[in-house]
Swiss-Prot record:
This is 4-hydroxy-3-methylbut-2-enyl diphosphate reductase. [4Fe-4S] cluster binds at C21, C105, C203. Keywords: 4Fe-4S, Iron, Iron-sulfur, Isoprene biosynthesis, Metal-binding, Oxidoreductase. Belongs to the IspH family.
Amino acid sequence: MGAMTASPGRRVLLAAPRGYCAGVDRAVIAVEKALEQYGAPVYVRHEIVHNKYVVQTLEKKGAIFVERTEEVPEGNIVMFSAHGVAPVVHEEAERGKLATIDATCPLVTKVHKEAVRFANDDYDILLIGHEGHEEVIGTSGEAPDHIQLVDGPEDVAKVEVRDPSKVVWLSQTTLSVDETMETVDALKDKFPQLISPPSDDICYATQNRQLAVKQMGAEAELVIVVGSRNSSNSKRLVEVAKQAGSRAAYLVDFADEIDETWLDGVTTVGVTSGASVPDVLVEQVLEWLSRRGFEDVEIVKAAEESIIFSLPKELRRDLREEAASLVAERGGSGTAGA
């Protein structure tokens, strides 16, 4: 059967922003630069970001992903993923005589620092997040004696604190904004003196991607979210789409996972992607839809993003030293080829 022609009634609403956030971009580039700088293999503790395509691409270039620090042979380089790690992991790396590169997203590092500061002031810290997620494990490890995990409003009833006047909430950076505030409201009902973090812990990229989906959800009968099933922020986009009024929303890693029956009775399809997703995967989804008559694409713009994070300091240091060495070999700064 040949490709369908575009129908005036069929269209795609394409979310903007979508895909890579600054923290993911930094982490992926860090692995690529480390492979260039040190050669393969470069070990990465946990998936650098939660995206199957990205991980497979980096594996082909020589990255080796491990779940435990002890899996890295002594004397090698290990990079910590964008989700962050607990202090005990740094200690494990030191015992294993491993050189470390910390690719933790700076916005996650901010939450870690808040946890340490409030723990030092002897606050009970209520961490809103999903049990077992790597980011939550890392943040909890910063102050294990002070942090309690609150996995949604239904967890609030069982929360106990030592002093109701010294309680603060923090959150995983990739949650649904609405769901988090529902949990915060429930916590405030129980602990009226609950303190909020100095600034919102849910990252700008998570909020912007959810806002774009909210704007398209009322018009799109179907929303396709490109992202992996272990990606918290991608799964939240599916939930947000349904809450915004979309009849159906699905998470796919690749275009070939889309079921044609999803298009039955659909004239408007919303398309977005999680913060760990390269745009090439979205382009493949758009091509798939175009071949089925959904050729008209409208951008739904919720925000501008211009944030860029610098590479991990360990990598910047070694790149600077290499550049200085090359200059010295060529007879001094700025004189080569003069």
